[in-house]
Amino acid sequence: MSRDLQNHLLFETATEVANRVGGIYSVLKSKAPITVAQYKDHYHLIGPLNKATYQNEVDILDWKKPEAFSDEMRPVQHALQTMESRGVHFVYGRWLIEGAPKVILFDLDSVRGYSNEWKGDLWSLVGIPSPENDFETNDAILLGYTVAWFLGEVAHLDSQHAIVAHFHEWLAGVALPLCRKRRIDVVTIFTTHATLLGRYLCASGSFDFYNCLESVDVDHEAGRFGIYHRYCIERAAAHSADVFTTVSQITAFEAEHLLKRKPDGILPNGLNVIKFQAFHEFQNLHALKKEKINDFVRGHFHGCFDFDLDNTLYFFIAGRYEYKNKGADMFIEALARLNYRLKVSGSKKTVVAFIVMPAKNNSFTVEALKGQAEVRALENTVHEVTTSIGKRIFDHAIRYPHNGLTTELPTDLGELLKSSDKVMLKRRILALRRPEGQLPPIVTHNMVDDANDLILNKIRQVQLFNSPSDRVKMIFHPEFLNANNPILGLDYDEFVRGCHLGVFPSYYEPWGYTPAECTVMGVPSITTNVSGFGAYMEDLIETNQAKDYGIYIVDRRFKAPDESVEQLVDYMEEFVKKTRRQRINQRNRTERLSDLLDWKRMGLEYVKARQLALRRGYPDQFRELVGEELNDSNMDALAGGKKLKVARPLSVPGSPRDLRSNSTVYMTPGDLGTLQEVNNADDYFSLGVNPAADDDDDGPYADDS
């Protein structure tokens, strides 16, 4: 059957569509504007319905109205009608994000009656077991069968357009073997953002993951961790897809050995850089947000506030509470060693290190709330007193020439301060005192399991207790930040802007949005060569020059653990020793890397993946369309096997590599390669790309009534 490859339909499926759970939500949300600009109403996102949150995420549309769909998209409407007639419930609308993509959210409870039938069918088709009490897997099966049902209906009703179905992670991957087995006329892409087995092996802490991958007995290890059935779904999805991709080179290496299929290419995660852009204002924003953090620090350390905030640096680590995978253990150990170095050297600088990772807690401690309240009370009292003093000076000055007074303006504090002012101030100051021997707390919340918390126990082990002699102070904030926080009223993005350095020494990080977000906000960061972001930036910037751009890359792959910790300490100490002018210059260089992470650049890799899927699904049509025989062994080969080469920069510190240059041997990001902006529009054969998209002023609701 001949289908239109250029005007194909795109359906993207994930469990985090309009459902904030983890990083995939951020990927889909930030990528939506460029995808909608490219596909218009040919693009739909599909996911499960979260009844608790969907009303805040989706603008519901009346899909039954004839005008809800264009004539080209009428098969989607008919497919939904067919499924509704069979008892399937769903929500159809627009996701309330930039770009406003159309979404279909299936209510899995409405198809739960098919559960046993579908689980039995999955076993008979591909031999994947499904334990009764694994609710996450059961929901993955329900979603997979529902999506395959929907795609089958659309493919049957629409014989005109090619259909590309893109699935993210194993939770959305059950539909892939079903599409293959049922011979549904769609081409498929599967992207793994992290492998199941990889997460478990790294979190165990007893496995040299990256150097022993080739020797892993995957079936045995999956069984040992009790995830064999999930692993089978993930592996079946990888092998059933027309195109298999990962988010980074390091994850591609992992997937090749754990899922037993070499990925066809890399789909690195981008950012909507416009959201973060502040142009020349970003330095001012740093100063403003830093002052907010200063206010918190004054309250947190009240009674022991013996360090100069102008000589204080704010470091932080943030993310999910994965103690080893996110590198929290290494961060705390390195801070203890940094503290020792700074004390021995007699440094006057202080480092306040924040750990922002959600853990079970019972809200804020009374001490944390009281400290902020006492400092605010002192601030208000000082403001009242200074206002009164100003009024007295003004009254004296304005009477002076008329009453024949010969005395000068009062300068003695005793004359300016009334006794009542002194009493108020003394009360506020005494309220800031701590009981003798009591130190500022290291945690801001009442922890549910304080005695067994890994982060707190590590802090206790290295004895970073916020003593006056410590040059490194610790603050563990076991909740994500938001502007309504009563002690640190900043959103996460604002907090990042106010900090000086983000530290993310992850051991298992397929991509790593936290250092990427730091980069686009002009905040230097420390990452590792086993994180996708770290490896990506290592390839983009000349050897040993990444840190000049505020990207410090710790070697956690080829160095022993203790050597990696020492390297991290070296980087942090080097940063502490910088002057303010050096830090400002470095932030300027860091912010200039933003364009390297923009979806306008990264999104081209998604275009390549879709082309490769269409090439493999419709080889004859594709050859006829392109006019030549193309190699479809992987994404890079399909695009002509172009080498990405860059010239050695003439400036010092080196500039980011010019991806259009042709004079050296570097390729990005690594052996699997990407094209990014090297290719021109002709290289993409205009498959589904609307060249006028950037000039289109119509809003996302232009076709809605």
UniProtKB/Swiss-Prot annotation:
The keyword Cytoplasm applies. Residues 693-705 have a biased composition (Acidic residues). The modification Phosphothreonine is found at residue 668. Keywords: Allosteric enzyme, Cytoplasm, Glycogen biosynthesis, Glycosyltransferase, Phosphoprotein, Transferase. Pathway: Glycan biosynthesis; glycogen biosynthesis. Alpha-D-glucose 6-phosphate binds at residues 280-281, 283, 286, 290, 500, 583, 587. CDD domains: GT3_GSY2-like. One of its GO terms (biological process) is glycogen biosynthetic process. It holds the Pfam family Glycogen_syn. Its main location: cytoplasm. Present with 14600 molecules/cell in log phase SD medium. Belongs to the glycosyltransferase 3 family. This is Glycogen [starch] synthase isoform 2.
